């Protein structure tokens, strides 16, 4: 019995020492931060799914208002949370070549080689390849597709509201974003079977796994094990869908000008070379195979579907809670559409300046893509501090923390679109608003996402007004 006790106690002692081995890292370097918990570091509530990680980082951000940087532990791995906007600007923009990797490595198989998750030269090739696809000129062609889906969406909403005017918003607007994304990406008309398939797929895409936590504890292990962050059921769907569409189009672009068309135009160039070689990376080319194309269409769908729907839902919630703002938006929508004969064009959207301010204030208050991660590619002396990051270490930026910092946004809980008037934007630090990221890894599809939200809101406000119901949640 005594032997069992000694063995058990020894085992626990060894495990304790192992899982706390790094927990003096920041203290030894005189970097302040919250006390870590054994095994979990500073993210225990996220690991046990009690609290979202974005809220944990926001709480840490707010707990150290005088610090430029804060030492934290993602599981057992030391990382640095950046608070100072000038430091963030250095990392994200000025010294970008040293921080162009997100640092979450996993298998390139099964959709892993997408532009969001790719790092190093792979990312550079993809970025150079796909940036021209998301210019205003290219995306203008998709506005007609969005607007057409918006008209069909409104007819559906009218039928639903005729039966019951009190509706939960998020399921409704998801129907629009699903239809908009699939037509703009794949040229697809949704039938009931496809809607059911996509609904099941969405539950897999947006269900959190423990892959991130495993990577935090053992950086790079997912790639070594050829494992992915995504369910194995997701890749076959996008692979098959991509191959089917390419075959239907004879492997060549049509005149539809959707995302698949633009990608097929790129594929006619056969291979794309990176712009330049940096550090010890190897210059490579990347062939746009069906699987590479599938990975890009997957991330386009995943990034544009739920984020846009959530933003629309939050925006309409705020309009319902602030009827004076809603009336101002409706007046602008009505007047602008009248000038443009009811058509939603690039010029129509450009002239709806107040709606644009409302959109940005929504993303300030509800930043759906919040946490920014970057890996140091070399030892790095953090500007304005005595801290040196070691090669391979990760920095974390809390967009939520910044967006709710009263230093940049007085009375941050208040919904105030005037924060994004041209004058206020000019007078604010460029890194004080980062819902799409910052620097060269800023979201490529941000303009598409903004237009998609605005088109849907314009269509809805042309027909309806929104009011809180007795079931409306006062807080999200």
From Swiss-Prot:
* The keyword Ribosomal protein is assigned to this record: no
Enumerate the subcellular locations listed in this protein's record, separating them with semicolons.
Answer: Endoplasmic reticulum membrane; Microsome membrane
Induction details: By furnocoumarin.
Which cofactors are required for activity? heme
Q: Which organism is it from?
A: Papilio glaucus (Eastern tiger swallowtail butterfly)
In the bilayer, the protein is annotated as: Peripheral membrane protein
Protein's name according to its UniProt entry: Cytochrome P450 6B5
Which Pfam family would be a valid example here?
p450
Under catalytic activity, the entry for this protein gives:
an organic molecule + reduced [NADPH--hemoprotein reductase] + O2 = an alcohol + oxidized [NADPH--hemoprotein reductase] + H2O + H(+)
């Amino acid at each position: 019995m005594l032997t069992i006790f000694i063995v058990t106690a020894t085992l626990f002692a060894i495990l304790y020492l192992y899982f706390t081995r790094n927990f003096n890292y920041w203290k030894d370097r005189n970097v302040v931060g919250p006390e870590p918990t054994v095994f979990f570091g500073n993210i225990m509530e996220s690991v046990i799914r009690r609290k979202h990680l974005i809220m944990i980082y926001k709480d840490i951000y707010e707990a150290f208002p005088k610090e430029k940087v804060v030492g934290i532990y993602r599981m057992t791995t030391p990382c640095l949370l950046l608070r100072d906007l000038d430091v963030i600007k250095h990392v994200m923009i000025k010294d970008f070549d040293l921080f162009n990797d997100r640092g979450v490595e996993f298998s390139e198989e099964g959709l892993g080689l997408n532009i969001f998750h790719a790092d190093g030269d792979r990312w550079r090739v993809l970025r150079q390849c796909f940036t021209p696809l998301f210019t205003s000129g290219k995306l203008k062609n998709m506005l007609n597709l969005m607007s057409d889906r918006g008209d069909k969406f409104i007819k559906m909403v009218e039928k639903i509201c005729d039966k019951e005017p009190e509706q939960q918003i998020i399921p409704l607007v998801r129907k629009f974003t699903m239809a908009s994304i699939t037509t703009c990406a794949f040229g697809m008309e949704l039938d009931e079977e496809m809607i059911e398939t996509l609904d099941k797929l969405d539950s897999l895409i947006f269900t959190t796994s423990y892959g991130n936590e495993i990577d935090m504890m053992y950086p790079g292990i997912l790639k070594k094990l050829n494992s992915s962050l995504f369910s194995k059921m997701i890749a076959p769907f996008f692979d098959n869908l991509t191959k089917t569409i390419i075959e239907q189009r004879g492997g060549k672009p049509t005149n539809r000008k959707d995302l698949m068309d633009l990608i097929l135009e790129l594929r006619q160039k056969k291979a794309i070379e990176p712009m330049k070689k940096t550090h010890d990376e190897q210059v490579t080319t990347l062939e746009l195979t069906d699987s590479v194309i599938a990975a890009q269409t997957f991330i386009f769908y995943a990034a544009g579907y739920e984020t846009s729907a959530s933003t629309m839902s939050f925006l309409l919630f705020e309009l319902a809670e602030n009827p004076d703002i809603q009336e101002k938006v409706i007046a602008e929508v009505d007047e602008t559409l009248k000038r443009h004969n009811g058509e939603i064009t690039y010029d129509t959207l450009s002239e709806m300046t107040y709606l644009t301010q409302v959109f940005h204030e929504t993303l300030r208050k509800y930043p759906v893509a919040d946490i920014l991660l970057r890996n140091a590619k070399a030892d790095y002396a953090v500007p304005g501090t005595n801290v040196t990051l070691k090669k391979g270490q990760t920095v974390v930026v809390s967009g939520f923390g910044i967006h709710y910092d009263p230093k940049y946004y007085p009375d941050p809980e208040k919904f105030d679109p005037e924060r994004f008037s041209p004058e206020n934007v000019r007078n604010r630090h460029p890194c004080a608003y980062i819902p799409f990221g910052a620097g060269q890894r800023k979201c490529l599809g941000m303009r598409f996402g903004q237009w998609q939200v605005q088109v849907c809101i314009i269509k809805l406000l042309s027909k309806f007004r929104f009011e809180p119901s007795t079931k409306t949640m006062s807080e999200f």
